[in-house]
Amino acid sequence: DSLEAYEVDDTGWRKLDVPHDWAIEGPFRIDLDGYTGKLPWQGIGWYRKHFEVSSKDKKKRFYLDFDGTMANAEVWLNGKKVGGRPFGYSSFRVDLTPYVLYGTDNVVAVRLDTEKFGSRWYPGAGIYRHVRLVKTEPVHVAHWGVFVTTPEITDTYATASVHVEIENNRQYAVKGQYTVDIYELDANDNISKKVASTAKRPVFLDAGTSVTDSVSLRVESPKRWNLEHTYRYLACVSVFDKNKLTDVYDTPFGFRTILFTHDNGFLLNGKRVQIQGTCNHHDLGALGAAMNKVALERQLRILKSFGCNALRTSHNPPAPELLELADKMGLLVMDELFDCWTVGKKKNDYSTLFDKWHEKDIETLVCRDRNHPSVIMWSTGNEVHEQYEPAKGIARHLAEVVHRFDHTR
């Protein structure tokens, strides 16, 4: 079970593409829990990936972004541990830069352990969501480092407030700059016309630090996102180091207002919408938990044909593709975090992680998903036992953590 070493001979290993769910292959076993499909999802699995990095890229930064790994992920590069995440539904980033080998073979090893992960439904097993290798300049937009809010929306104009976090990974201070351009997006994610832009804005970054700045842009005659017409825009942030373009970071968003009222229910853009939703687990039935965007879109089209207009991501963070589809197809989303808090429902469930990880897992979900117009609310839990002990203050605490990263919902 020590397969992270660089020199491990993996030539005889099975070759496959991720996303991958090893458990859906079966076989079914009568002795296993029916709640998790009587499938052999509990076990330990290893993945290894070889890749080369050009010697020309020695001054670049390299990251691996995982959308989800089931579960208790540990990640190594060339035998050196670079990070991981225990919660199988959380996205996370690891920094590969210190251990990258240039001009020769690099090996990423990922160990997953679902034996120490409890679930009340079928979770799948493996690297079941997408992984991306990210290469950047030392001065770049931080991970999920753009937050677009829309404080003013009228028929005549709208205001987009763009909050940008820029990182400086150099060993010296940098006088940087950034610009923001806003474009219309069509249904196929193609950029249409530019509708707003800024001049270059200066930012001073000390060595090894990040800086957050914000700018407001006025968009004339905004097209509002709604369930019938899913108009979207793109905020394009360009970062400069000594007038050299070092990063371009795109963030889709939409103009829309949401309001819950005591006498007229939910209002989208000032108009009442009867929420008709379903609670959706992340698996794709017989296809398992491995992300398949076409299969997921099929599920959503079937639900819409029934009259469904809303989704609850029961009971965990969804794949990013779900929210992308909800934005495009016109669905409202309750974006959910946890099935339990400090009191568990199954052995080795999230209650064993709550104290150490809940704030980080909240930050991850909210920062990743807060720009989606389809997301109308955050859910911090499902049928939690602590609801009978409000004096503990956990619900209030979780709401406060959410609002650190999103004050708009």
Task: Annotate each language-model stretch with its function.
Residues 96-98, 214-225:
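Short, hydrophobic beta-strand segments
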Residues 109-111, 234-238:
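Extracellular recognition modules
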Residues 86-102, 116, 121, 172, ...:
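Active-site mouth of glycoside hydrolases
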Residues 37, 42-149, 169-170, 317-320, ...:
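Accessory beta-strand-rich segments of carbohydrate-active enzymes
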Residues 1-30, 107-113, 118, 127, ...:
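Accessory carbohydrate-binding/adhesion or oligomerization-edge regions at the termini
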Residues 44, 103, 157, 205-210:
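Solvent-exposed, conformationally flexible loop/turn segments
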